[in-house]
Amino acid sequence: TGLNVMTYAIKEWGIGNSAEENILKDWTFIGVPYCNGDFHAGTNTKEYTALDGRTKTIYYEGYNNYRKLVTKIFDYINDSPEQLLVTGSSAGGFGAAILADDAIELFNNPQDVTVHVDSSLLIKEDWHDVMVEEWKSPKAMRDVVMGDNITLDSLVALHQKRTDVKILFDCSVRDFNLSQAQVFFDNG
């Protein structure tokens, strides 16, 4: 139901609504659901052992899922738009930052690109190690993340590579889930 609520909200009040004043009302909208904890950057399946000895398999397949979805959609839409907006909020904003360069290439390098990341800030010292060891993120993505801010590192690398891309990054402490995640990162 969470995806349905989010899809409804985007369609009714967000960038996907059909209101006359919405400058994006005639755009094609592709929603990539976020669901497995790897910010759309994983290509790995990993088994973990809990403290009680039980094992669990986690499928960090976010990058693979995103690529399959977008390339399949190209059967139905133009893969070379004049303009491209890559955006996401909360956990999805991490994916927007990390995948922006990849998405630009997938859409054949449009001339007018904007990347908007909304409320995607988590400070963690070992993001690079997570991308390498846990998620097995593509090299081009993980190699730009060297600090404690995965979003900022990804956006700075995007700007250094593509100076013409417009980058917007806004953040709020009102995202309860991200605030809780940061407390967990900080205090365990």
Regions found by a protein language model. Name each.
Residues 45-46, 56-83, 101-188:
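Surface cap/lid and interfacial helix-loop subdomains adjacent to catalytic sites
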Residues 41, 96, 179-181:
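Short glycine-/acidic-enriched loop or helix-start segments at secondary-structure transitions
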Residues 31-36, 90-92, 119-122, 171-173:
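Short, flexible loop/turn elements at secondary-structure junctions
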